[in-house]
């Protein structure tokens, strides 16, 4: 069996085009364009690349994009003060603080300071709690983007045995809740899991998010499984690969996401969707 490739790049472009059309319709109706504030503290090169892609996506769909590039020496108090200002700004629908933050700044305190209705990353405990209680509002971008991919490929997830490898706050944990909502029987594995291979071999739907190149061998994959590879790992030779050995896994899976061009583009597309949702549902006058 040769797996069908889940083309995240194409689906992400579709999502962005849909958002752009809705923004044009808003402006034609006399409503304002959604606004996203992107805050970067310090000069982490990887963060700069991520932030640039988010700002570019904003401008492409017609959002107002506001950039705040703060020096590495910024204090926690100064960052919290900026968030307070953005929370009170009626032209800003989403606030994104790029992680990781420099040493000395408490990530949790910063994320909790963002108003839940402007938390377009979906990391605020309120939004995570809403997802947990089956009443989601703004949802974490990567897990939601993965669900969108499955939906757009008409993959029926109800009753599937889903296995998530990696239990991070950004992907693994919220992913498990999205999969429960999607009707899966969900197992979350992590660094202390015994006999990982056994779990992988029984997975109808496998989501791998550990950040280790080639962590899952292709011969572990169940015949006909759906494989979603969240890993983005740059090798010494410059090649970008996922957490799954793609060539071998693709021989056994029914569907598989490539790296790059699979999950990555969906994260930014979902951020854009979340910002429009925040604008329409929580900040428009009729949304009150």
Curated annotation (Swiss-Prot):
Pfam families: THF_DHG_CYH (PF00763), THF_DHG_CYH_C (PF02882). Catalyzes the oxidation of 5,10-methylenetetrahydrofolate to 5,10-methenyltetrahydrofolate and then the hydrolysis of 5,10-methenyltetrahydrofolate to 10-formyltetrahydrofolate. Belongs to the tetrahydrofolate dehydrogenase/cyclohydrolase family. This is Bifunctional protein FolD. Keywords: Amino-acid biosynthesis, Histidine biosynthesis, Hydrolase, Methionine biosynthesis, Multifunctional enzyme, NADP, One-carbon metabolism, Oxidoreductase, Purine biosynthesis. It comes from Escherichia coli (strain SMS-3-5 / SECEC). GO terms for molecular function: methenyltetrahydrofolate cyclohydrolase activity; methylenetetrahydrofolate dehydrogenase (NADP+) activity. Pathway: One-carbon metabolism; tetrahydrofolate interconversion. InterPro entries: Aminoacid_DH-like_N_sf, NAD(P)-bd_dom_sf, THF_DH/CycHdrlase, THF_DH/CycHdrlase_cat_dom, THF_DH/CycHdrlase_CS, THF_DH/CycHdrlase_NAD-bd_dom. Its EC number is 1.5.1.5, 3.5.4.9. The gene is folD. HAMAP family: THF_DHG_CYH. GO terms for cellular component: cytosol. One of its GO terms (biological process) is L-histidine biosynthetic process.
